[in-house]
């Protein structure tokens, strides 16, 4: 497993500064936020980010797009979003599945999302890119079952899940979900409150669930992708926070590798 930092972890700093912090701390890659840090995604902006990351020794692991499959706007938007990911030199493009939660969907809404994901995965593969599906409330991937069914229905080697903990789940439920979804995941986001269903992020070492046990589930499944810090505690200076999270995750990854 490799450790990455999502540039959305600090939306106030210029993206170049976030990249510098990531490199200084020791992260191996970054996920580039697809809004303010990228502007309109023109060739010059992407080239600048790609060059800066390369000079700092960072992979652009993911382009964090807001492309939504299964919606009317997908057909007109996906080629442009793939071009941005390509310009950045990203390994994966993050996408959003539908605009309703699993269980609230109609069969046609689910099938539309699956069809779009297959199309996207095929076109992405032509560019040497993979697709990662955001697991998030308000989307078809909000539940374990919804996320599992989506990935299984798409059934494409270059399309997986961007797993992240949803704080409505208990620690036991999170661990069970991780065991089910780790084999279907190609990216991981980590963030946490100190208490279940909390709003304020804390250091990952203070998470209400055992982050190390979660990573063990992924290690057992043979996961070898990025584990990315997404949102961080606001109680300390930014660089100190992402450094602490990196040190903690590094210790857990090394332990998992040796167990």
Show the residue positions of the predicted features.
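Acidic/histidine-rich catalytic cores of soluble enzymes
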Residues: 16, 29, 119-208
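Active-site groove signature of glycoside hydrolases
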Residues: 85-105, 127-137, 228
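Alpha-helical scaffolding segments of alpha/beta enzyme cores, especially the outer helices
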Residues: 17-21, 44-51, 55, 76-87, ...
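A structural motif
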Residues: 27, 90, 185, 223-224
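N-terminal pre-domain/capping segments
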Residues: 1-86, 90, 156, 160, ...
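Conserved beta-strand positions
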Residues: 5, 32, 63, 95, ...
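Acidic-and-aromatic substrate-binding clefts and catalytic sites of carbohydrate-active enzymes
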Residues: 8-15, 32-45, 67-76, 100-105, ...
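Conserved active-site loop/cleft motifs that coordinate metal ions or position small ligands
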Residues: 187, 224-232
């Amino acid at each position: 497993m490799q450790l990455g930092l999502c540039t959305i972890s600090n939306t106030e700093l210029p993206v170049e500064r976030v990249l510098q912090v990531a490199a200084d701390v020791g992260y191996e890659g970054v996920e580039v936020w697809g809004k303010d840090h990228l502007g309109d995604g023109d060739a010059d902006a992407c080239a600048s980010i790609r060059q800066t990351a390369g000079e700092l020794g960072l992979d652009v692991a993911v382009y964090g797009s807001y492309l939504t499959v299964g919606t009317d706007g997908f057909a007109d938007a996906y080629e442009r979003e793939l071009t941005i990911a390509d310009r950045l030199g990203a390994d994966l493009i993050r996408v959003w599945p539908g605009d309703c939660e699993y269980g609230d969907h109609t069969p046609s809404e689910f099938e539309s999302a699956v069809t779009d994901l297959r199309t996207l995965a095929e076109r992405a593969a032509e560019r040497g890119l993979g697709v990662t599906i955001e697991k998030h409330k308000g989307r078809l991937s909000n539940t374990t079952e919804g996320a599992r069914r989506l990935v299984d229905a798409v059934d494409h080697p270059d399309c997986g899940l961007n797993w992240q903990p949803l704080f409505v789940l208990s620690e036991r439920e999170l661990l069970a979900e991780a065991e089910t979804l780790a084999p279907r995941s190609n990216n991981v986001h980590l963030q946490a409150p100190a208490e279940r269903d909390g709003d304020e992020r804390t250091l990952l070492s203070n998470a209400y669930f055992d982050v190390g046990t979660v990573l063990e589930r992924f290690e057992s499944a043979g996961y070898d992708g990025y584990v990315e810090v997404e949102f961080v505690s606001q109680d300390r200076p930014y660089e100190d926070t992402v450094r602490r999270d990196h040190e903690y995750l590094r210790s857990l990854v090394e332990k998992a590798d040796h167990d």
